[in-house]
């Protein structure tokens, strides 16, 4: 009899849970419609892969690209809608979150054609690669709209797990395995530190998990200036610093960049930065509203360290991917300026604008590296010597992207940095902006050093890799060149049309 009653209670509880989940999905599902499109694409990929004996590779790429493009279209149609909180407070939909989701989707869309030729030439498993990319993109999108501590922790873990699997995708490569192990161990440690900070925030606010409710809870408990909040701030800053590759939590970045497949590095170099920037902006601006002076100081120190260490160590690198790893550490230091400035002096708008330009500059550079690596099998900077004599298009494309990363006018990187530094100067961050300007000059040095190698015509400096270089061993008009052309055009002319980009970015403010 007791067993019968317990069984009935279990059925009733299960029914209530199912009905509540169905109700949430029915009435709140439209708020995560872009994410639902990606989930549908993932399911479709899995079904085709598991049921079809003869796998049509082009179909996999078509499904992945189409789901990403459709998600972008839905986001654009949803632009300027009223901010909404859905799924019992787990997600918040507004223009600010959606612009970061757009940047993540754009990065993933450009990375897929960049990886097609590489995967085919290296005979990697295609379906799993696309599944991991889409799942990581999904995790990044959920992170951008997350509104409570649990979702904010789970979403980046979804992204991180896929990142670990992607970085170790070439299982027979010893460097890749070593990089993945370092990435996994340090990623696990940083996640533990982050969730420990969340626990202090949760306790200090009286058991609240929603971001805005945490602020109200801190006011009610009078704990907003307590030591517990300072401890939470330190732990959360360390955890986010790892996600952003901020010094001194940057040691994993060069090894992962060097050991991972180049398309994976291209994907991680932009999507992880965008998602972590969205996380940092929301966490610091809302729950730590009363500790703004403290987190401003912390981020200033980390930004200065990142800009100095990243750019100075990049000078000494001989591997192109390691050089870009240290360069990205310096680049994220510039982005931190926008986070510190906030929405009062256009800081968020300048950060979003620069992130958009950074995506095109960085992916354009990696597209050139993928193309060169497939034709020569090398990543050494010295082996690029004389590339202009064999492939002027590739050499010029790489040169333009590197110059844009350095911030030389009239390229997009110059206008992006100009707007970012100007907003920082207006906010009174004179020392931070001065360091940024100085390190930008330093970065131009090592970018120009590579460009000088590209353009050299002296036979004694040209390595056998370039001397035996074939113009088109891959298919003509391949997908890598498509990504390369799009990114190079965006890196060169998008800075000229900055006004509409800035206006759109300013509309995303809270």
UniProtKB/Swiss-Prot annotation:
GO molecular function: NADH dehydrogenase (ubiquinone) activity; quinone binding
InterPro entries: NADH-Q_OxRdtase_suN/2 (IPR010096), ND/Mrp_TM (IPR001750), Ndh2_N (IPR045693)
Bilayer topology: Multi-pass membrane protein
Transmembrane segments: 24-44, 57-77, 99-119, 124-144, 149-169, 183-203, 227-247, 295-315, 323-343, 354-374, 395-415, 418-438, 482-502
Keywords for this protein: Chloroplast, Membrane, NAD, NADP, Plastid, Plastoquinone, Quinone, Thylakoid, Translocase, Transmembrane, Transmembrane helix, Transport
Gene Ontology cellular component annotations, sorted alphabetically: chloroplast thylakoid membrane
Keyword Metal-binding: no
Reaction equations catalysed: a plastoquinone + NADH + (n+1) H(+)(in) = a plastoquinol + NAD(+) + n H(+)(out); a plastoquinone + NADPH + (n+1) H(+)(in) = a plastoquinol + NADP(+) + n H(+)(out)
EC number: 7.1.1.-
Subunit structure: NDH is composed of at least 16 different subunits, 5 of which are encoded in the nucleus.
Functional summary from the UniProt entry: NDH shuttles electrons from NAD(P)H:plastoquinone, via FMN and iron-sulfur (Fe-S) centers, to quinones in the photosynthetic chain and possibly in a chloroplast respiratory chain. The immediate electron acceptor for the enzyme in this species is believed to be plastoquinone. Couples the redox reaction to proton translocation, and thus conserves the redox energy in a proton gradient.
Descriptive protein name: NAD(P)H-quinone oxidoreductase subunit 2 A, chloroplastic
Species of the source: Lotus japonicus (Lotus corniculatus var. japonicus)
Gene that specifies this protein: ndhB1
